[in-house]
Regions:
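Structural detector for short beta-strands of small beta-barrel domains
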Residues: 2-23
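Beta-strand secondary-structure signal
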Residues: 13-15, 29, 57-59
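OB-fold (S1/OB) nucleic-acid-binding surfaces
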Residues: 20-41
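Short nucleic-acid-contacting surface segments enriched for D/E, G, S/T with interspersed K/R
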Residues: 42-59
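OB-fold/S1-family single-stranded nucleic acid-binding modules
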Residues: 61-92
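Acidic/His-rich, divalent-metal-binding segments that scaffold phosphate/diphosphate chemistry
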Residues: 80-198
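Divalent metal-dependent catalytic cores for phosphoryl transfer on phosphate-bearing substrates
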Residues: 139, 144, 161-273
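C-terminal membrane module of polytopic membrane proteins
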Residues: 258, 274-289
């Protein structure tokens, strides 16, 4: 994911493997989020990619020559085809760009401890299945299926972009993204996301740490400072005037912004275009718009 320019719709996530190697070309299979391709490519295009199969980020070119694909991110740690295909199946229709961003941030994560933590979370199929389908609230903001994923992605991207814009360091950008993505993950155990009566009604922040216990424990052993910074993004903020870590401040700010924009959009959802004010039943607030 390019924090500076995220509008390139040509980026795609693909499981790739070599089908056949010929004299001057190679035949590769690309299994993407929604479809598959078999392409003849110059050998240099796929240099460094495991021919047995792995996950990559690709950028498509409209040309039909042997240079039509550019590998923008080589995710060499992910070589389990079954795990990748399971992840693809979890993707709700219309959320493909979110999944690309979620994996694309690996292109910026160079700290090994943080990278291992993040991959451990992404490759937990049971956790991701719950996370992708959950609601962010019962009757407040993003209260639809997949709403938690949409809200968390908004917070992650906006917080990371603010950290980049204010030049607080590449590691802070990554912590802001991951902290924003996971700041509400404990909500999968709240009553409105539970299939049975086992769901609880309470503070989801406590459940953030329960859900992420194993990868957080490993992160603490490998990098106590990053553990502390990421934990500050996941914890309850009561009675604190400011955060010690800037990524946590950005996550908190962007969390509130995402909720507010959702309320604003919902208020105007069924209002005629010529109306410039509307009431949100979600938070009993009047909103105005400029056009």
């Amino acid at each position: 994911m390019n924090i500076k320019s995220r509008t390139n719709s040509a980026d795609d996530l693909a499981w790739v493997h070599l089908i056949e190697r010929r004299k001057q070309v190679e035949l590769w299979q690309f299994c993407c989020l929604r479809q598959s391709y078999s392409l003849e490519l110059s050998p240099n295009i796929m240099e460094g990619v495991n021919p047995e199969g792995q996950l990559v980020m690709v950028q498509w070119s409209p040309s039909n020559d042997l240079q039509r694909v550019k590998i923008t991110l080589n995710i060499h740690e992910v070589t389990d085809k079954a795990a990748v295909h399971h992840h693809f199946k979890l993707v709700p229709a219309g959320c493909e760009s979110i999944i690309i961003d979620i994996w694309g941030i690996l292109g910026l994560i160079h700290d090994e401890a943080l990278r291992r933590f993040y991959l451990a979370v992404l490759l937990n199929n049971e956790l991701m299945g719950q996370f992708f389908n959950a609601r962010a609230s019962r009757s407040h903001h993003h209260n639809h299926a997949c709403g938690l994923l949409e809200h968390s992605h908004e917070v992650a991207v906006t917080a990371a972009m603010l950290c980049w814009r204010y030049n607080v360091g590449p590691l802070s950008v990554c912590v802001a993204f991951i902290g924003g993505l996971l700041h509400d993950i404990g909500k999968i155990h709240l009553f409105y996301n539970a299939d049975t009566r086992d769901g609880i009604a309470g503070s989801h922040e406590s459940y953030n740490f329960m859900v992420l216990a194993e990868p957080l424990a490993l992160l603490y052993r490998n990098s106590p400072k990053i553990f502390e910074a990421l934990s500050s993004c996941l914890s309850v903020k009561i009675g604190r005037r400011s955060e010690a870590y800037i990524p946590a401040s950005m996550v908190r700010l962007c969390d509130n912004l995402s909720m507010e924009v959702c309320h604003w959009r919902t208020a105007f959802a069924d209002v005629p275009p010529h109306h410039w004010y509307a009431h949100s039943a979600m938070n009993d607030q009047w909103y105005k718009r400029l056009g």
